[in-house]
Amino acid sequence: KCTGCWAAEYGNKLNLTFDEIDSIIMQGKELGVYFYIYTGGEPLVRKKDLIALCRKHHDCQFLTFTNGTLIDEEFADQMLDVKNLVPAISVEGFEEATDGRRGNGTYEKAVRAMGYLKERKLPFGISCCYTSQNLDSIASDAFFDQMIDWGAYFAWYFHYMPVGNDAAPELLPTPEQREY
């Protein structure tokens, strides 16, 4: 569980079954919706279901927010096969910041996942939750250059919101930082 993350507050009681997700996608397609985003916790704990949904709905595009720790060579090959699943790998900056918020070894696993994806020429991006402590780092040219070198095509930036039992108000960016 990541420091200050709201997703863990819900536990797994709100997880949808494969059939429920499939039904939502079918209903969405009837309405002209062909792009779907998986969020967490960690969506890749259900890799098998995600790949099956990608295969079944090959006319749709899927994006998943992930810490990247479950992307291995086999899963990267499956992504290459389906061609319609794009991960946004969560990093909080460089190693110290990412591991500090997401757990020791997370950064190394995320970088390894980026390597598997880049080797296969699979599109992926990064997802960053900016805080009072990491904003300077994740907005730096050095950070962008590193992520581009590792193959990232896009970046999502989310403003930290202190929500839930583990909220850390000191991580909230200052008004001056938010203007940056």
Regions found by a protein language model. Give the residues of each.
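Radical SAM/AdoMet-radical enzyme domain recognition
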Residues: 18-38, 46-159
